[in-house]
């Protein structure tokens, strides 16, 4: 399994270990400037919402995240607190699609993981 995300506990931030994940439609959709525009970042270039969503995905779904052995309900609660997502952001269909895609990647039922690995290998050959 490719480790797409990590968590920088020193700075309390999500780290994208494999930027190729943003080539996957469901994750690219989280990353648009329009979607990420907010009061703190009117142009959306800092991707504040996208990073909050990735924090939730990592904390709630990733098998290597802190608390991954906890119950799904507790993981959800902790992920909501850690990410700062609102209920409206959590129920957003684009975000929920990214959550489902990440579960597929975790379960190995998606061809995206091997496809990204192949893409990465080809880049290293160049």
Task: Enumerate the language-model features and the residues they cover.
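Leu/Val/Ala/Ile-rich N-terminal alpha-helices, chiefly Sec-type signal peptides and the beginnings
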Residues: 1-47
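Generic alpha-helical secondary structure signal
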Residues: 11, 60-62, 82, 106
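Extended hydrophobic/Leu-rich segments
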Residues: 14-16, 27-31, 48-58, 83, ...
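Short, charged, low-complexity loops and linkers
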Residues: 28-43, 75-76, 100-110
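Short, amphipathic alpha-helical "recognition" segments used to contact nucleic acids or chromatin
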Residues: 35-78
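Short, basic interhelical loop/turn and adjoining N-cap
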Residues: 73-91
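Charged, helical or coil segments that form electrostatic protein-protein
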Residues: 87-126
């Amino acid at each position: 399994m490719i480790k797409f995300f990590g968590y920088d506990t020193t700075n309390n931030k999500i780290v994208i270990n494999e930027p190729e994940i943003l080539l996957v439609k469901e994750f690219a959709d989280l990353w648009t400037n329009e979607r990420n525009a907010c009061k703190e970042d009117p142009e959306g270039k800092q991707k504040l919402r996208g990073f909050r969503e990735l924090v939730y995905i990592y904390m709630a779904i990733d098998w290597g995240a802190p608390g991954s052995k906890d119950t799904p309900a507790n993981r959800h609660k902790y992920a909501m607190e850690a990410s700062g997502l609102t209920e409206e952001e959590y129920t957003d269909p684009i975000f929920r699609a990214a959550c489902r895609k990440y579960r597929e990647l975790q379960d190995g039922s998606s061809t995206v993981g091997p496809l990204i690995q192949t893409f990465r290998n080809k880049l290293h050959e160049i």
